[in-house]
Amino acid sequence: MERMVRVFWGPRKETPQELAGRWKAMLHALPDLLPEASCAPTGQPWTWTRHHTSGRPTELRPDEADLAAALQEDHDSPQTSDGAGLSLSSGGEQGWEISISGRGGGESEYVTQAVVLKVASPDDAEVPEAALLALIADIWEPDFGEATDDELLDTLEDRAGFDYTLSHVSVGRLGYLSARRAALAPAGVGVAAEELRGAGVLLDIAPPGDIEAVVDAYVRLRDAGALEPLPRPMNRTCL
């Protein structure tokens, strides 16, 4: 089974060195939450596989100097139009693999910035989605985020009019809303599981498999204005 934990935000200028600090904090915390997703001995730092736009993958250590150099390289690439990003993966025990891609530091008025973590695991495995979303949201200070999967996204598209091509905002089994979005959320939609940095709120919406509850929460949050897309052209990081 593959799950996604992802966050999005609008323009926020940051240097590759500043982004490296966020990446380091995230990558150093992931082994405690997903120990099965690497072959590294317990307690040892992971070495990640870095995927490039062209050419073979390379190894990347999650220390700040190497991360800053990799982000600077991407920032300076002729193929990069805004910000700097990385695409990393790690494989571990049988059936476990994670990939994480992200781009930040940009000032585009039309393309949101994002971090997307994908976790492939055995069907019966427990994945700490709430802890993962809380970690990523706390580090990256996004506008919104969610824990979801392809089936949920397809259902929202078919039954509730969700369309990612129109920059629609969605929520899955878990949702993260920045402060202004959280203030618009109607009472009774999910449980405020945790308040994070910047007054953002992590919402526990439904257990795995309860698609009806997710569709209902999505519609209620959307109709209340809590899932309003950032205006285009974007002039701020969060709603």
Regions found by a protein language model. Name each.
Residues M1-W46, D150-L239:
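C-terminal interaction module
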